[in-house]
A protein has these predicted regions:
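Fe(II)/2-oxoglutarate oxygenase catalytic core
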Residues: 3-210, 214-241
Length: 241
């Protein structure tokens, strides 16, 4: 869901987000000092790393991932900085029946740090070295779980539709050797990003995007070199089934 021309305070953003459920806190990233529910995502001119620039669903490395995300734009570049979204219902439904049958009971192992498909094995703090503003927000997750096993094919608790549940946090597949798992994951990640499944949102200051992580992947485009500042809130979800 997208909204244009909004003017809301941090407190109003939190109040709106809470209509959809309990606020989910990022285990690795500190929120605003006065509103810790909000993660401020900033890229300054010259920064070489864009937060969220690979296809993913938020907090997939948590045993109870965020079910939804709300992003509010404060400052945006004149061009670029769009966000891509991909429909994972369609990603599942367009797989062949034999492929769906093979994958229906497969589990994925997902990690929050030290490994991301499309980026490599660098630790989060090292990946953010080219974006010192975001690097300064990194914290130790402490006892918060940052590894999780999830079904590869997820059933939405409200719509009851099945979707492909995979992303850059997915490290391997239970029951498959490394070569098999890598081949299947690479195929599914490429399949999940097919052009016909996607839409592209062009940000303006005052825009809000609200999406369901249980059936949607997203990706921030790293095609700009101006300041971009957004406020993100994630909503706590249930254990994927």
């Amino acid at each position: 869901i997208f909204f244009r021309d909004q003017k809301i305070t941090p407190r109003e953003q939190i109040n709106f987000a809470q209509r959809f459920g309990e606020i989910h806190f990022h285990p690795y990233m500190k929120g605003l000092d006065d509103h810790p529910e909000i993660l401020e995502i900033i890229k300054e001119p010259g920064d070489g790393y864009t937060f969220g620039s690979v296809w993913h669903t938020d907090q997939m490395f948590n045993p109870q991932p965020a079910k939804a995300t709300m992003l509010y734009a404060h400052e945006v570049p004149k061009t670029g900085g769009d966000t891509m979204f991909s429909n994972q219902y369609l990603a599942y439904e367009t797989l062949s029946e034999p492929m769906r049958d093979m994958l229906n009971n497969v589990k994925t192992f997902n990690v929050g740090d030290g490994f991301r498909r499309g980026i490599g094995k660098a630790k989060r703090i090292d990946r953010y070295a080219k974006n010192p503003t975001m690097q300064a927000k990194i914290r130790d997750p402490g006892n918060i779980p940052t590894e999780a096993v999830h079904p590869l094919i997820r059933t939405h608790p409200e719509t009851k539709r099945k979707s492909l549940y995979i992303g850059s946090h997915t490290q391997t597949l239970d029951g498959f050797n490394a070569e098999e798992a890598d081949s299947i994951i690479d195929f599914l990640r490429n399949h999940s990003q097919r052009h016909e499944f996607t839409c592209r949102f062009r940000w303006e200051a005052g825009s809000i995007a609200l999406w369901d992580n249980r059936c949607v992947q997203h990706k921030a485009l790293a095609d700009y070199d101006e300041k971009r500042r957004t406020h993100r809130i994630t909503i706590a979800g249930e254990i994927p089934m």
